[in-house]
Regions:
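Generic N-terminal leader/processing signal
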Residues: 13, 29, 71-72
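C-terminal structural segments of small proteins and small subunits
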Residues: 48-74
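Short, Lys/Arg-enriched N-terminal segment that forms or immediately precedes the first helix
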Residues: 2-17
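Acidic side chains
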Residues: 8, 39-40, 67
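Amphipathic, hydrophobic secondary-structure cores in small proteins
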Residues: 18, 23-56
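Residue-level detector of intrinsically disordered/flexible regions characterized by low predicted structural confidence
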Residues: 17, 33, 67, 75-76
Length: 76
């Protein structure tokens, strides 16, 4: 699969984005977590495609595999 995710300090302050866009991986994750579908994202952002979204998910997965602990607060 082509890697659609790039990071350039001149674009979105270096946040990972989909190549050729200003659509951040963060935005894609937020929209999917809010219940939007791939089709919803593609309709709202025509420069996206299924492979770009999957690439963003793979990037996020790889980033979370780093040996970093993210303490989470328990909610009641």
């Amino acid at each position: 699969m082509k890697n659609y995710v790039v990071s350039d300090p001149a674009i979105m302050m270096g946040k990972p984005v989909i190549s050729g866009t200003r659509i951040t991986v963060e935005l894609i994750l937020e929209k999917l977590a809010a219940g939007e579908t791939f089709d919803d994202l593609i309709e709202a952002h025509p420069k996206l495609n299924k492979h770009a979204i999957l690439s963003a998910l793979k990037f996020a997965s790889e980033a979370l595999k780093a040996d970093v602990v993210y303490p989470l607060k328990k909610t009641a």
